[in-house]
Amino acid sequence: NKLAAVICIEDPVRPEAPEVIARLKELGISKVVMMTGDSERTAKAIAGRVGVDEYYSEVLPEDKASFVEKEKKAGRKVIMIGDGINDSPALSAADVGIAISDGAQIAREIADITVSAEDLGQIAFIKDLSNNLIKKINRNYRTIVSFNSGLIALGVLGIIPPTTSALLHNTSTLLISMNSMKDIPVEAEIN
């Protein structure tokens, strides 16, 4: 009638998780929410260690998907990161679903992106890359619209002939296309 042993089982928190979450916030992610099927006590402890803004414990798969839908209806873009079968409905409902490579096959199939389980820093890398890609697209768009508007104005005023305008237009399109092919700078990955 004596206690022989106590066994505690815990999924260890990835050591880079707090740094990845901090980096995502620096990159413009305004709210990081953790949803888990774990108990309140476990969820609170993990949430405190990794630095999420909100956490929900004892959550069922359909609750995760409902939360994603609610956030989308509120006008937010939702990125869902998950690795299990229970994450699949929410991964499917999110604007962007990210699966972890060693997770359930269905999660990987449903997700838009799969990142390596060995390097969660890839999530921040992807966000940084996408931010810089959008900046490049917007810069190229403004440049080409401004340049072509100038060509139209010069053509309407009779300052340049149509053949010169066509040549300059095609040259600018080629230069913008070449600029689009240049590497997009991103900061070093988190390891």
Regions found by a protein language model. Give the residues of each.
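Cytosolic catalytic headpiece
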Residues: 1-86, 92-96, 128-131, 189-191
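Membrane-embedded alpha-helical bundles of multi-pass transporters
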Residues: 26-29, 50, 86-87, 92-96, ...
